[in-house]
Amino acid sequence: MAAIDGLPPLREVIRAHGLSAKKQLGQNFLLDLNLTAKIARLAGDLKGSDVLEVGPGPGGLTRGLLAEGARRVLAIEKDARCLPALAEVAAAWPGRLEVLNADALEVDVAARLTPPIRIVANLPYNVGTELLTRWLSSGWPPFWESLTLMFQKEVAERIVARPGSKAYGRLALLSQWRTEPKIVLTLPPEAFTPPPAIHSAVVHFTRLAGPRYPADAAVLSRVTAMAFNQRRKMLRSSLKGLAPDIETVLRDAGIEPTQRAEELSLEAFCALARRVAG
């Protein structure tokens, strides 16, 4: 990568700017430029696309995204200590990198980017799930074409989980309802500085033209939240606040009231959401 952008290795960048990952910000820096380049390639053809990156840190993945031909990268970094390192990346790629010192949860990113838009990020562990839920819950089709995101491996496994598995839950349902998520890369702790206690994984989400099964998004969100908040209870108990005669509602949707949330397929949850919505 240094041969492409003329910038030094990331370990030198971190040393030069006195950077260290902050646990309270969910930071773990990925320093291997071969890996950051691979993640950028796993996002697909970036030429002609604007790319949103959240939590760029010292800019390793940012460099990969620019080298892969992203038309423009918007990098949102909450930690002001990383800004000088990112400014060096911006200088190496004039006019193609905008760095925003802000909290990604508070930024209207769609208004700052031009379609087609792809989101590629090594997400800070403390906000990754919340950001994903927001991006999946927006109107459909969403403002983005695809998501390529790094999570803790345990979170990635929850995203692609199937009914009946221990990892299966609301995150799997929301992800699989309108996208095709796939784990495309697993990384060991030693790939990061400092090494986290767990493995990490990259998930690529291909958006679908529409939902797999019809349902109102708000109702489906409410039903799944109630069901999985008490996942070990029978649905007639966990969903009793959903309707006066919840057992009849469940049976009308083809669901046995004694079933538990982890046993229901996405199709069954959508059928229940339609029945609740009337």
From Swiss-Prot:
Family: Belongs to the class I-like SAM-binding methyltransferase superfamily. rRNA adenine N(6)-methyltransferase family. RsmA subfamily.
UniProt-recorded Gene Ontology molecular function terms: 16S rRNA (adenine(1518)-N(6)/adenine(1519)-N(6))-dimethyltransferase activity; RNA binding
Residues given in the record as S-adenosyl-L-methionine binding sites: 28, 30, 55, 77, 103, 122
SMART domains per record: rADc (SM00650)
Organism name: Cereibacter sphaeroides (strain ATCC 17025 / ATH 2.4.3)
Gene3D superfamilies in alphabetical order: Ribosomal RNA adenine dimethylase-like, domain 2 (1.10.8.100), Vaccinia Virus protein VP39 (3.40.50.150)
Compartments in which it is found: Cytoplasm
Listed HAMAP family: 16SrRNA_methyltr_A
Superkingdom to which the source organism belongs: Bacteria
Record's function text: Specifically dimethylates two adjacent adenosines (A1518 and A1519) in the loop of a conserved hairpin near the 3'-end of 16S rRNA in the 30S particle. May play a critical role in biogenesis of 30S subunits.
Entry keyword set: Cytoplasm, Methyltransferase, RNA-binding, rRNA processing, S-adenosyl-L-methionine, Transferase
Annotated EC: 2.1.1.182
InterPro entries: KsgA/Erm (IPR001737), rRNA_Ade_diMease-like_C (IPR023165), rRNA_Ade_Mease_Trfase_CS (IPR020596), rRNA_Ade_methylase_Trfase_N (IPR020598), rRNA_adenine_dimethylase (IPR011530), SAM-dependent_MTases_sf (IPR029063)
Protein name: Ribosomal RNA small subunit methyltransferase A
GO CC, alphabetical: cytosol
Catalysed reactions listed for this entry: adenosine(1518)/adenosine(1519) in 16S rRNA + 4 S-adenosyl-L-methionine = N(6)-dimethyladenosine(1518)/N(6)-dimethyladenosine(1519) in 16S rRNA + 4 S-adenosyl-L-homocysteine + 4 H(+)
Keyword presence, Methyltransferase: yes
